[in-house]
Amino acid sequence: MPKLILASTSPWRRALLEKLQISFECAAPEVDETPRSDESPRQLVLRLAQEKAQSLASCYPDHLIIGSDQVCVLDGEITGKPLTEENARLQLRKASGNIVTFYTGLALFNSANGHLQTEVEPFDVHFRHLSEAEIDNYVRKEHPLHCAGSFKSEGFGITLFERLEGRDPNTLVGLPLIALCQMLRREGKNPLMG
């Protein structure tokens, strides 16, 4: 049975994969994440997830390698990590009363036989109308400077939302586990069977 590799250094993705109670290792993929001018958000996350998984194949020749990538889209534009408090406030002002869509690309690459499975999972976050004071308090309390969209849904960010829509809530954090379990079963690795 091939071993499992998570092509990511994200502590959030690692924590999500640990929910499946299967043995895995993490490795950092070497991928240029620059978007191409002709790529849609869906195409971007699909390409990057695939490249991340395949980039580790030579180092891990008989493994199942998981690649994942996510973008946050508001008004048709990709919204990155804010990095500063002012940018976080600006992103939250734009999101207030709107729908933010997260696209998460997932790839599972079997480096032993070259079989690749891919999927893109959308997830919609419906923001309630936020006051300036709420935005300021949220940024001060949660400090979401390294989170796309300027919030942490698994934390205090839940207070910003009116509704969440998607097949798998794990998608919003960065790794669609329902889709991943389906892919793993197709490769003969059922998380419920060890």
From Swiss-Prot:
The active site is at 69 (proton acceptor). Pfam families: Maf. One of its GO terms (cellular component) is cytoplasm. InterPro entries: ITPase-like_fam (IPR029001), Maf-like (IPR003697). The record marks 12, 70, 154 as: Important for substrate specificity. It catalyses: N(7)-methyl-GTP + H2O = N(7)-methyl-GMP + diphosphate + H(+). The keyword Hydrolase applies. CDD domains: Maf (cd00555). It is an enzyme of class 3 (hydrolase). Its EC number is 3.6.1.-. Transmembrane segments: none annotated. It is found in: Cytoplasm. Keywords: Cytoplasm, Hydrolase, Nucleotide metabolism. Gene3D superfamilies: 3.90.950.10. GO terms for biological process: nucleotide metabolic process. Its cofactor is a divalent metal cation. Nucleoside triphosphate pyrophosphatase that hydrolyzes 7-methyl-GTP (m(7)GTP). May have a dual role in cell division arrest and in preventing the incorporation of modified nucleotides into cellular nucleic acids. HAMAP family: Maf (MF_00528). Belongs to the Maf family. YceF subfamily. This is 7-methyl-GTP pyrophosphatase. It comes from Escherichia coli O6:H1 (strain CFT073 / ATCC 700928 / UPEC).
